[in-house]
Amino acid sequence: MSLRGFLGALISASLVSACGGGNDEPSGHSQPDAGGEDASDASAADAGDDGSIDDASVPDAPADAPVDTDATTACGTASECALADEQRASDKMDSIVNDPTALGQFLTAVPKGGDLHNHLSGAVWAETYLGWAKSEGNYCITNSSLALSTSCGNTSTTSPVPTAADSLWLPVIRAWSMQDFVAGAETGHDHFFATFGKFGAISGSAHHAKGLADVMQRADSENALYLEPMLFSNSTAGNVGSAVWSGGTLTTAALPGFHAALLAYSGWNAAVQAIVTDITNTESGARQELGCDGSSPDSACRVGSRYMVYISRSGSGPAVFAQMVAAFEAAKIEPRLVALNLVGPEDGSTALSAYDRQMEMLGYLHTAYAGKSPLHVTLHAGEITTKYLPTSYNIANINHIRKAVEVAHAERIGHGVDVLGESNPTELLYELQQLGVMVEIGLSSNTQILEVDGTNHPLATYLQYEVPVALATDDQGVSRSSMAGEYMRAVQDQKLDYKTLKLMARTSLEKAFLPGPSLWTSFEALEAVTECAPTASSYYGEDPAPAACQTYLDTSDKAAMQWELERRFREFEAKQ
């Protein structure tokens, strides 16, 4: 079975409403075959509410047929032909919406634009981590917690890293992910966030290159073009911040002076350079893993990527601020670094108490670095519900989304589940629409962490108010999902149609932090720059692009990626 056929099989019969069943890794690149009780033996009838992906046996998709983009066919102009193909693809999806196998294959093949909300450590599947740990040989499993460890001297408290044939295999996968999870004494919220500590011994910077290569392969196999993974924290900068600050609570008024002190500190340049070094090592290592510079490069080498720094919400004020400053400084010299984000449970005690102060830090830096650093800001905000909020807080007074946008100047929002719980939500929705703030939608993790899905999810509301939205994986390894899995949820749980999925894919690239101007002069009207405007004989995505258009595309990474998305849509739709 081809890789694409394999992935179609994995997605098929899965994610009906909130259900999922299989346990297999959805990429055939580095996973050992699961055995025993692993997902290869699970059936759709055993599907649970963990968002996992079912492995239904389906035949390979037929080989790709050549695409006829000749505008002289009976449909009329090139534009008319392209729109006719689009409608045929839409009709095709409508006709198979109740056939999970066919729908899974269809959605795996659909072009998906970019995955803009992707935590690298949570994107790698448990089976992959176990394979690395087994092959490297210096790891073991702590019996009491099922966490990976390098302290393996006591054989009475640790066990060897399991293989698929071992009885410990499935319990470890369940501990490291949402596989087969059923809420009880432990909530989905708590289990989800606890997984990261279980595999933390192998998810750090030493394995970022292998992790990035793995995620690029999975993206390519599902026809995604672009990634913006959250890759790097910067403990070096955090340590500098803690060392430099000695004034008690870091107030907003003290930020300018502390900022200057950081820049003057003798070890500061090394803290900034640590980010640049991490990016260089990770990207070059991933390219080496994929053979991108060799004679037979992996097709995943064509997946574009830019990177984010992530900062834990639970850090001390001086450490968090220093990490923010380091990111703004690093972006001045490293163009592959495009954004920062704050991570960790938004309803944690420190995250709640420090939220306003952290937004003020970003607001200060927005002004301080205006015109000096190209760094963007995207923030987790609104990933919160009353169920997990401490009783001392009134959710209507939280207003995390509003503060992220108005105070911290976030250009994108991650999750935004609580938008209707904020004060004056209608005004906020209009503000998001007017400012063009995109919401990164993670349907699987919203179901698993917050228990929000179906009509309780705000995705339909965002679409109603024309707020830009795009689907994202969040932590696909922990969730046991993928981009195709998120598309399946969007269709089956959120009842989205083909043209809405296509709009969201286009939106993901329009709102990506790629350099260069957009292909579109009016994204809403789908009107391109003059050089790339349709003619009677050419339409968006023409291959090759018209000469004047190609000249424009050569000046903009963003526009070039957008044109490639249109080309893939043309190719996909012509086959339906």
Where are these regions (language model features)?
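Residue-level signal for mature regions of secreted extracellular proteins and peptides
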Residues: 12-13, 68, 74, 542
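Sec-dependent bacterial lipoprotein signal peptides
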Residues: 1-17
